[in-house]
């Protein structure tokens, strides 16, 4: 709430009074041009950076004052690129849990990991090295690692950034299904406005370190996109979904 951040005391604010709220199970999408402040906001939420002022609250707990372990019990992170090494799928997911909650796996940890593998239909991959898997499969393992923390909020940094179109849709559907089934909130950055409209429930458009627009699908208009991205588009409806089109093809806005 009212989050402010700058790199030096004499530098301008990169985040200037940013406020946003997500309900449990709600998917929020951060949008804006490069340099708008999306990564900086995520770093503040994850505890990588500390805000100059303002609060980051979850269930009434001020996350700016929480320990690494306390934060990990509430907030998980899925980066755009994650290094798995030669670990098996099972070990990689377990590591995602033990990194925060203990050095040795207890029976309770094993049950958590085994349930995630079953829920995400990863049984056939469990003993394979993650290095052997496709990009879409690796991204699915990254989501499973985050789920192993049993968080209330998962922060995604461009979850489909390195995937082909078929896998992009699969990952978005998987993440959305888990959010709704587990009542987990998601906050994700995306460059593709059409993916965002497909994935999200609520949208936050950053400009010059401020959230200039916030709301549901209804706020997304050609005037908004012109203001944020300086791009002229048309918005049409396909199968009851808004689609942003830049003649003659759909556009990816970044």
What does each model-found stretch correspond to?
Residues 13-15:
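Conserved structural motif at the start of ABC-family nucleotide-binding domains
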Residues 31-33:
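The feature captures the beta-strand-to-loop junction immediately N-terminal to the Walker
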Residues 54-62, 71:
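Conserved ABC transporter NBD signature motif
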Residues 108-125, 150:
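Conserved ABC ATPase "signature" region
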Residues 129-133, 137:
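Conserved ABC ATPase signature
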Residues 154-158:
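Catalytic Walker B motif of ABC-type/P-loop ATPase nucleotide-binding domains
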């Amino acid at each position: 709430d009212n989050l402010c951040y700058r790199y030096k005391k004499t530098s301008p604010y990169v985040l200037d009074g940013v406020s946003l709220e997500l309900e449990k199970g709600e998917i929020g999408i951060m949008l804006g041009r490069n340099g708008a402040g999306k990564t900086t906001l995520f770093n503040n939420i994850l505890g990588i950076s500390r805000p100059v002022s303002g609060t980051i609250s979850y269930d009434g707990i001020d996350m700016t004052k929480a320990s690494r372990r306390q934060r990990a019990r509430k907030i998980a992170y899925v980066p755009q690129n994650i290094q798995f090494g030669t670990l098996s799928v099972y070990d990689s997911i377990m590591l995602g849990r033990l990194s925060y909650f203990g050095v040795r796996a207890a029976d309770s940890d094993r049950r958590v990991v085994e349930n995630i593998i079953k829920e995400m239909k990863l049984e056939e991959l469990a003993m394979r090295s993650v290095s052997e898997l496709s990009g879409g499969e690796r991204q699915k393992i990254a989501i499973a690692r985050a789920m192993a923390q049993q968080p209330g909020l998962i922060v995604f940094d461009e979850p489909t950034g390195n995937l082909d179109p078929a896998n992009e849709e699969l990952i978005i559907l998987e993440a959305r299904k888990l959010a709704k089934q587990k009542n987990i909130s998601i906050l994700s950055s995306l460059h593709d406005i059409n993916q965002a409209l497909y994935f999200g429930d609520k949208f936050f458009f950053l400009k010059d370190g401020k959230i200039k627009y916030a709301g549901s699908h209804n706020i997304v208009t050609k005037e908004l996109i012109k203001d944020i991205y300086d791009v002229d588009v048309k918005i049409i409806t396909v199968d009851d979904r808004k689609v942003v089109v830049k003649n003659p093809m759909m556009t990816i806005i970044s």
